[in-house]
Curated annotation (Swiss-Prot):
Annotated residues for binding of ATP: 42-49, 649-656
Protein name per the record: UvrABC system protein A
Record's subunit section: Forms a heterotetramer with UvrB during the search for lesions.
Keyword DNA-binding set for record: yes
CDD domains: ABC_UvrA_I, ABC_UvrA_II
PROSITE patterns: ABC_TRANSPORTER_1, ABC_TRANSPORTER_2
Residues in ABC transporter domain copies: 319-596, 616-945
Keywords: ATP-binding, Cytoplasm, DNA damage, DNA excision, DNA repair, DNA-binding, Excision nuclease, Metal-binding, Nucleotide-binding, Repeat, SOS response, Zinc, Zinc-finger
Role summary: The UvrABC repair system catalyzes the recognition and processing of DNA lesions. UvrA is an ATPase and a DNA-binding protein. A damage recognition complex composed of 2 UvrA and 2 UvrB subunits scans DNA for abnormalities. When the presence of a lesion has been verified by UvrB, the UvrA molecules dissociate.
Pfam families for the chain: UvrA_DNA-bind, UvrA_inter
Family membership noted in the UniProt record: Belongs to the ABC transporter superfamily. UvrA family.
Gene Ontology CC: cytoplasm; excinuclease repair complex
Lineage: Bacteria, Pseudomonadati, Pseudomonadota, Betaproteobacteria, Neisseriales
Amino acid sequence: MCNHHPKHSHGNDTIRIRGARTHNLKNVDLDIPRHKLVVVTGLSGSGKSSLAFDTLYAEGQRRYVESLSAYARQFLQMMDKPDVDLIEGLSPAISIEQKSTSHNPRSTVGTVTEIHDYLRLLYARVGTPYCPEHKLPLSSQTVSQMVDAVLKLPEDTRVMILAPAVRERKGEFVDFFADLQAQGFARVRVDGEVYQLDEVPKLEKNIKHNIDVVIDRVKVKADIKQRLAESFETALRHGNERALAMEMDSGEEHWFSARFACPVCSYSLPELEPRLFSFNNPMGSCPTCDGLGNTNFFDPEKVVAHPELSLASGAIDGWDKRNQFYFQMIQSLARHYGFDVQAAWETLPAKIKKVVLHGSGKEVIDFTYLSERGTTFNRSHAFEGIIPNLERRYRETDSETVREKLREYQNHRACPSCGGARLRKEARYVYVSGEPLHEVSAWPLTKTHRFFETLDLDGNKKQIAEKILKEITERLGFLINVGLDYLNLSRSAETLSGGEAQRIRLASQIGSGLTGVMYVLDEPSIGLHQRDNDRLLATLKRLRDLGNSVIVVEHDEDAIREADFVVDMGPGAGEHGGNVLIADTPENVAKCENSVTGQYLSGKKSIAVPSERTPVNPGRMLVLKGARGNNLKNVTLELPLGLITCITGVSGSGKSTLINDTLAKITARELNRAQEEPAPYDDIRGLEHLDKVINVDQSPIGRTPRSNPATYTGLFTPIRELFASVPLSRERGYNVGRFSFNVKGGRCEACQGDGVIKVEMHFLPDVYVPCEVCHGKRYNRETLEIQYKGKNISQVLDMTVEEACEFFDAVPTVSRKLQTLMDVGLGYIRLGQSATTLSGGEAQRVKLALELSKRDTGRTLYILDEPTTGLHFADIALLLEVIGRLKGKGNSIVIIEHNLDVIKTADWIVDLGPEGGDGGGRIIASGSPEEVAKVKGSYTGKYLKNIL
């Protein structure tokens, strides 16, 4: 072991941990300096998260929550008390984790960061409302302001002052004209024509008319002030508080209103309030879509799932031969319109398709129905149409299951009323400096930031807005500093990746400006290009300089080198980890012999650049043409098959759109027969070289504690078969199901095979206690009496992969799968470990192992999205070996990645960019790493050049 306890003076400047035993920690004693940037690093599974999150954060949070009243505690999640003897020097803790924010469709980047709240305030206080119809500002003027406006016109301009008396009303208005004459007026303007009052033509009764009373005609001179003022006063009296000055030569009109309203149509608003601009408030949300910005509709393309089939054989699910009632309707339609139910849907005329999908309108059709007794009866009525039928069933059903089923046929589209702006009409026509709120929210953050930095308001508006603007620009600045300049405020929070969501939370934390807090972060560099790394580190240092302790679990080399203090966990993973190898400055860690991290930092170990690249075979290319989803600019992607291709580019350059939303979905639809809707593209060629696509992402392998690596990889089935074939099992007649903890029979019924029982404590966190009957073993006594090589099924589930590998080495079906788990570096996880306790990186590697263990044809396309998340240098070397094995069998691998160690070992690179958001979406460079390194304008190339 290297020097691992720099002795600090035990004052207020250290966090002292003594005897930490959470998860796999081996009684760890550790002193961490406070108010410093501390990086915790080590192999995947070495106990970093156990130390940072499950010990430090859990205890900091728990102590803070304990200080609150019992009433307040019930609303907060209480953390379990970590297994530790003593922790001193803790501050209240805030954790910023990888979990993608919310699945609430109402959450946007603006609402999560609270910038939207400040914008609402700004628009309510200094916004200028406009009339949606006439695009004129709503404003009220005094008579003297109206007079001044007319006097500003060039001298000698002939002006007519009018009172708009009737607007868009039907009638003959005979009495009205007589009344005006009696009051001494001489002229009126009717529908744009000026007449003497006694010469007005007879008006048509059923047409809407506009009538203005002519009050005065003047030439603009300085001495007509008094006369103008009197004319305007008269005009306002007769024109419903409105007046109109028309230049007689050019016909140009100047409208005035004495009320806060549109001078033309009197459209007016109550006083502007912040809630008018909230799409989560009925006052502000668009009434059509309730502020969601999109509406669901039944999509004909999804309803007709198999257009190549006939109606009889299942072009439309549920309306074919197997469903007698609905199919009788289709047959009756076919008789009425004379089409063939056996003909493929694609070949039917458009008119017939329209009737089948949308109904026959008013046309009555004779339907013949067959009752259950076998008698037929006839009815005549219009045909409802399949889509209206689905809409009606969706509206009327009370069953969530039916709704779920019907949702499969739905798609979203932008709301027809607000066009996706989410706000009601009144709010969409309030402008600040000529821009409405929903437009500003849709800009990339850099543009929004510039707009508010340079916003120039006049007079008292400037004073009102000053503080609000400071908050808005500061918060936008923080978002830009963590590399999110390409996002916009209206972007839905559920579409953000884990790394983006985490950095947004990081930015809002800096925005809140707390001091004296302990922040615990989980790999904030995920999804960040090398270029943005410096800005992220500057942000973390800024958090530290505010007076906070910043503890980061991180594998990124720059972060480790820039830290004030590094804690290296190890030496191995799982059972073999849980010790602190060294806790010291980065310089000293690099000198430490035992530390794998140190060896990579000092350059003793490194991931080698392959001596030669596999050449591209021009005959085996996958070509995707015209991809234009999100920000892609009509891109053509050429992927050499049978190689490892890295898709690179700064955050927001379009990598996920191109690969996950376009390529993965097209290939899944064409090769795996999946119901996927890819982003728009023109054409794809070269699919004949592939027979399936596998997308290995970081989503959890199961959301319930019952899901575990053994069940997920299919290991558990052969293990249960082994136990069922033991002589004692045969004797008792036990089958495979006896050894499952998910079905009745072999499992312990007291805890239903969970091994723990949840006890609800109202003011405290729910407590999970081991089941008293089976003592956490999940099975009943009879099942546990069956042993294979001296171990029962519960003991097998408790083995680590490594132990199980030795135990089952004589059983090829099991050992093959176990070996692949070993190969991806997961020897330390337990077979029965609950899926919910696996990190994203671990879940992804379990999936990789599952794919590796399958017999494959060598014609598979593997898609991996940032597989290095959660991986240490040494783990990355392992991962690259595994990917190399997949390639060795002839498969094609596409990796979205920022990690330079992976990028430099790829055969082919496709670099998107140059920037994120609108500034991205183009392919800047493609070729071998050496070729890309030479491309000017490619950020990836610039960093590759330094290491190749």
